[in-house]
């Protein structure tokens, strides 16, 4: 089963998504399969950081609305074969604990690490992600 790591901060702009992307890449380059799960709906950025924006067909919003199967929203990073991403919803949507747990249950045996890239601040997304995580990392300053 995957080790689930939540990445968070008290405010925006401190580098959460950068830390998430680089941590994911570091694990992936060591041959550990990694799934980045971006939870900052309406403000996604991991697709840009990983250079996969043009590959997004479905995102977390589509999973939540039932417009696609979860596996169809997974984007494999072309320069890092062990790194995959589910991009945040393009428009704000509530990501429930149930949704996160469903993804972990469905893909936990395929990925050694699942990294939950949370939105800034303390809110329901962080609370839901933290309930599902084994480890947490708080980014304090840029």
Set out the residue ranges of the language-model regions:
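P-loop/Walker-type NTP enzyme "switch/lid" segment
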Residues: 36-109
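Walker A/P-loop phosphate-binding motif and the immediately C-terminal alpha-helix
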Residues: 2-40
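Residue-level recognition of oxygen-bearing side chains
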Residues: 19, 69, 121
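Short amphipathic alpha-helical segments and helix-helix/interface helices
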Residues: 24, 101-104, 130
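Conserved catalytic-core segment of NTP-binding enzymes
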Residues: 108-109, 113-142
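Residues at the starts of beta-strands that form the adenosine-phosphate
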Residues: 33, 82, 134-135
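Flexible glycine-/small-residue-rich
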Residues: 9, 38, 87-90, 118, ...
């Amino acid at each position: 089963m995957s080790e689930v790591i939540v990445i968070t901060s008290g405010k925006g702009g401190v580098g959460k998504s950068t830390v998430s992307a680089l941590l994911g890449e570091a694990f992936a380059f060591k041959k550990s399969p990694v799934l980045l799960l971006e939870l900052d709906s309406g403000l996604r950025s991991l697709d840009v950081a990983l250079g996969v924006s043009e590959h997004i067909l479905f995102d977390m919003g589509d999973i939540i609305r039932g417009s696609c199967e979860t596996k169809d929203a997974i984007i494999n990073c072309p320069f890092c074969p062990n790194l995959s991403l589910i991009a945040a919803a393009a428009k704000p949507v509530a990501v429930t604990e149930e949704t996160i747990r469903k993804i972990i249950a469905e893909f936990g045996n395929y990925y050694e690490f699942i990294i939950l890239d949370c939105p800034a601040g303390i809110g329901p997304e962080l609370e839901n992600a933290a309930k599902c995580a084994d480890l947490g990392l708080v980014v304090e300053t840029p």
